[in-house]
């Protein structure tokens, strides 16, 4: 392949600083020949920490995928550990769409027999277990632990987030007797190397894993199957505030890319 791979990393929340952080993390591992476009929805929650916010964020993910399809994007990463809107995005996209939770679980089992997950808030633990079951990794995961740090506090130096997440990872490794840690929030992406050095086991960041896998799938000529469940949605009227999402309608041009 001679042309650059165009990879769109979608931060499902609307906080620009987190979009920038996610974009930097993706670019570190993307390598030559991959153009990373980190974007966020034009509307939606400032962070995703509940089922309600995840449902709202999914609409923003689909907005950015539709815009990406009109712009010739080759692959997508949904950069929130709940993988919001992942199945729906796969119905819309020509190329592969990866969620960071699914990618992180795969990566962890490639470097360790069993792993543990350290996430942000206790209320998100159930969603992590749900995804482990769905993706087939429940037996490989020894536990899911919350460090009780709100998502937006992860980038606040005054919160002591790095130290608190590191302590939670160390405690989880010892309690679960595992050989790897999966970080359960895209906002933790910048901590990976420091935590791994401190704890002494591989620490998997889903943004890095999904970025690497998405580019590899494009290079291998693999894309989401258009047969069966991931076939394009049928065209039908969509009314009200979501009318612009009707299949066949022109997507809004108001993408919000980072610099």
Q: Where are the regions a protein language model picked out?
A:
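N-terminal beta1-alpha1 ligand-phosphate binding loop
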Residues: 5-29
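Periplasmic-binding protein-like
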Residues: 9, 70-80, 177-185
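Short, glycine-/small-residue-rich phosphate/pyrophosphate-handling segment
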Residues: 17, 109-147, 160-163, 216-259
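N-terminal beta-loop-helix "entrance" segment that forms/cooperates
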Residues: 38-63, 152-157
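Short, well-structured alpha-helical segments in soluble
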Residues: 55-72, 163-177
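Glycine/small-residue-rich loop that forms an oxyanion/phosphate-binding "nest" at active or ligand-binding sites
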Residues: 58-113, 117
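Short hydrophobic/aromatic-enriched beta-strand-loop microsegments
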Residues: 95-102, 137-144, 201-208
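Active-site rim beta-loop-alpha module in soluble metabolic enzymes
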Residues: 129-185, 191
